[in-house]
Swiss-Prot record:
Keyword set, alphabetical order: Hydrolase
Family, as annotated: Belongs to the isochorismatase family.
Record protein name field: Uncharacterized isochorismatase family protein YrdC
Enzyme Commission number(s) from the entry: 3.-.-.-
GO molecular function, one term: hydrolase activity
Native source species: Bacillus subtilis (strain 168)
Family matches, as InterPro entries: Isochorismatase-like_dom (IPR000868), Isochorismatase-like_hydrls (IPR050272), Isochorismatase-like_sf (IPR036380)
Pfam families: Isochorismatase (PF00857)
Length: 187
């Protein structure tokens, strides 16, 4: 029997277009997610959207603010699942794990924003919960950040270090092309 798969699209929301986040890497991440999404839908495999929400009225992620909306380039279809979350992990305080298990999904492919935060936390938990987890390196992105000593790390460095901490221990890291050629087209 073929293993059931789910594509998880984490927090691809308009809030991340705000200039407050600063410099970003992988400007084509959403384009790559869209490519994967199109092929995933053709296969009839499960698509799950994760949408971050905040109860703080001034937050970009508050449901009344435009930033809460999922970006048009990866717009969900009516029958696709949207799970809202309030913390970094897509598994905490949501029914994601239950949904995956009820639908006998054992393999998950994770994409979305941002690599060091919600994508990383979701990937770690997915791996810890025993799912066969894949993270798509060019279908995620990071912003530059400062550490506790005010040292600045550019977006590419943050992204690459985040991927390095996940590689092999929590997930298999693939590019969009690798996923399409070695995973989607062979299943």
């Amino acid at each position: 029997m073929e293993e059931k798969k789910a594509l998880i699209i984490v927090d691809v929301q308009k809030a991340f277009d705000d200039k407050k986040w600063g410099e970003r890497n992988n400007v084509k991440a959403e384009e790559n997610i869209s490519k994967i999404l199109e092929l995933w839908r053709e296969k009839g495999w499960t698509v799950i959207y994760i949408q971050h929400t905040s109860d703080k009225p001034h937050s970009l992620f508050h449901p009344k603010n435009e930033g809460f909306a999922i970006k048009e380039i990866v717009k969900p279809m009516d029958e696709e699942v949207i799970i809202t979350k309030t913390v970094n992990s897509s598994f905490i305080g949501t029914n994601l794990e239950e949904f995956l298990k009820l639908n006998e999904i054992t393999t998950v492919v994770i994409t979305g924003l941002t690599t060091p935060h919600c994508v990383s936390t979701t990937t770690r938990m997915s791996g810890n919960l025993g799912f066969d987890t894949y993270l798509i390196s060019d279908a995620t992105a990071a912003f530059g950040m400062r550490d506790q000593n005010d040292t600045y790390y550019d977006a590419a460095t943050i992204h690459n270090i985040s991927l390095a901490t996940l590689h092999d221990e929590f997930a298999t890291i693939l590019t969009t092309d690798q996923l399409i050629n070695d995973f989607i087209k062979t299943h």
